Amino acid sequence: MKFYKYCASGNDFVIFADSEKKDRSELAKILCNRYEGIGADGLIVIVPHDRYDFEWEFYNCDGSKANMCGNGSRAAAHFAHHHLKKSQYLNFLTGAGLIKSFVDDDIVEIKLSGIKDIKEAFEYKDRIWQGCNTGVPHIVTFVDDLSEFDINLCKEVRKKYNANVNFAKVEDDEFIRVRTYERGVEDETLACGTGMGACFYLAYLNQKVKDDILIKPKSNESLYFRLEEEQIFFRGKVKCCFEADYNFT
């Protein structure tokens, strides 16, 4: 079967299309292994849907399923448009709900599913944290210096609150830098779309930024976020790195 290796702002994915849904947890662990497989943060499988352009199955590299992945959804839209010959304007179903996207060559913009479960700020380990769900749960702490990012603290917070963990530095009211520890990967990743979305929304909610800003994750790639009627849109580059055949048996 043919698969495609994708990169989107620092996150990488293995993507292929199939005719039916089924459990691919073990396959995800094999394909995403960076030493014995292809290597990726996640596996995306595109399957048909009778109402929308397609539906996806998303697996983290540890084989666990995730309802949503922001950069993964941009990669999926790029794949569907360029390789499955779908429209530039796409509606597709994820575990977090309907995602709308627009593909313009290698720039892809998506509208995240609605923001929910907004938490009151709280203190933990001498830091102020706040959480929300932008498709998957995130916890955010705003810092003066991103070198304060503490991988051991992230592991502790992730386990305690069962959420992705983000450290965010507001450079000015139009620019944020973000570092993210992701569930399922169980490590810091080069980027996380839903994590950046959570940082953007909580910064906006606390009057730290405007409603249209630039965010740079650890990969240092530029992503642009805007808020319209309580909906988060974000766009950035997507790259198909290569395609190849793989024996999935």
Curated annotation (Swiss-Prot):
Keywords from the UniProt entry: Amino-acid biosynthesis, Cytoplasm, Isomerase, Lysine biosynthesis
Pfam family, one: DAP_epimerase
Cellular compartment(s): Cytoplasm
Reaction it catalyzes: (2S,6S)-2,6-diaminopimelate = meso-2,6-diaminopimelate
Annotated GO CC locations: cytosol
GO biological process assignments: lysine biosynthetic process via diaminopimelate
Pathway participation: Amino-acid biosynthesis; L-lysine biosynthesis via DAP pathway; DL-2,6-diaminopimelate from LL-2,6-diaminopimelate: step 1/1
Biological role stated in the UniProt entry: Catalyzes the stereoinversion of LL-2,6-diaminopimelate (L,L-DAP) to meso-diaminopimelate (meso-DAP), a precursor of L-lysine and an essential component of the bacterial peptidoglycan.
Subunit structure: Homodimer.
Family the entry assigns: Belongs to the diaminopimelate epimerase family.
Name of this protein: Diaminopimelate epimerase
Lineage summary: Bacteria, Pseudomonadati, Campylobacterota, Epsilonproteobacteria, Campylobacterales
Name of the coding gene: dapF
